[in-house]
Amino acid sequence: GLNALKKVFQGIHEAIKLINNHVQ
């Protein structure tokens, strides 16, 4: 339920951080 959604959101957040680091 909500916990799984939280985990997915965390994964997306981590991916965005990685992409931002890579772009800079």
From Swiss-Prot:
The keyword NAD does not apply. Keywords: Amphibian defense peptide, Antibiotic, Antimicrobial, Cytolysis, Fungicide, Hemolysis, Immunity, Innate immunity, Secreted. Expressed by the skin glands. It comes from the Eukaryota. It is found in: Secreted. One of its GO terms (biological process) is innate immune response. InterPro entries: Antimicrobial_19. Coiled coil: none annotated. The keyword Nucleotidyltransferase does not apply. Transmembrane segments: none annotated. GO terms for cellular component: extracellular region. Pfam families: Antimicrobial19. Antimicrobial peptide with activity against fungus (C.albicans) and Gram-positive and Gram-negative bacteria (S.aureus and E.coli). Also has low hemolytic activity against human erythrocytes. Belongs to the frog skin active peptide (FSAP) family. Pseudin subfamily. This is Pseudin-2. It comes from Pseudis paradoxa. The lineage of its organism: Eukaryota, Metazoa, Chordata, Craniata, Vertebrata.
